Amino acid sequence: MASSIGVLVKFNLFIQAYVPMYFDRIPELVETYNHNINSGLFDKVYLVSDADVSSIYKESDIVKNIIIKKARNFNTIFRIINMCTGEKDINVFANSDIKFDETIKLASRMKNYEAYALTRYDIYEDSDEHQLKPGMKCYGITVLSGEKR
């Protein structure tokens, strides 16, 4: 359970799940999903999609499917989170290809009702520095504390 890592808040992961148009992406998505649900970082994982994605993502005790028919925008995201969250929970809404490590627990310092948009980075082959590649679009993770109004 995520709270046993020394953090007193509950961490929920909301994955924007989908069946990819190019099936060669499926192994990457499955590996990322398995990593995140087995990491111990999240108390609950929600697969948010507009279709049944059970053919790709295996069942788990901590996973719940949420099928939505509306386009995903922040109002929809907040509505979904409010249905599933407690006032003190940390809610991470992410694309399905993002792996998390212990650094996500830094979000436990968030104040109630704060929200952050995180970016991902790459390591250049000729450097150990973590930096963004020129022209790289960076999005895919939103972290929210507590219920949203």
Task: Describe the predicted segments one by one.
Residues 22-23, 51-57, 124-126:
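Short, charged/polar "capping" segments at the starts of alpha-helices
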Residues 48-91:
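Active-site-proximal specificity loops/subdomain of glycosyltransferases
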Residues 90-99:
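The conserved acidic donor/metal-binding loop of glycosyltransferases
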Residues 98-149:
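Conserved catalytic core of nucleotide-sugar-dependent glycosyltransferases
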